[in-house]
């Protein structure tokens, strides 16, 4: 299930690195990196935490694209 995300883009807008983002939402830098690369899909709870820190909606960051 491909989950597209704009986490890196939004994170850069608030000038926060992966380590800082991880600390803000309670995960490791590696988890943030995996999410940005598309190697890991966050839980609903984590997606909501990320959206809250970035002050955007979950839909602004993450989008689902059906495989054709």
What is each of the regions a protein language model found here?
Residues 45-60:
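DNA major-groove recognition helix of helix-turn-helix/homeodomain DNA-binding modules
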Residues 19, 30, 59:
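Residues within helix-turn-helix
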Residues 27-40:
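Recognition helix of helix-turn-helix/homeodomain-like DNA-binding domains
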Residues 60-68:
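Short, charged recognition helix plus adjacent turn
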Residues 37, 56, 66:
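Short, conserved catalytic or interaction motifs in soluble domains
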Residues 5-23:
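Short basic helix-loop element that most often maps to the first helix and adjoining turn
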């Amino acid at each position: 299930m491909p989950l597209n995300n704009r986490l890196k883009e939004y994170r850069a807008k608030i000038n926060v690195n992966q380590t800082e983002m991880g600390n803000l939402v309670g995960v490791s830098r590696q988890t943030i990196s995996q999410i940005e690369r598309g190697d890991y899909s966050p839980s609903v709870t984590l997606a909501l935490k990320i959206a809250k820190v970035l002050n955007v909606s979950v839909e602004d960051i993450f989008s689902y694209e059906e495989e054709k």
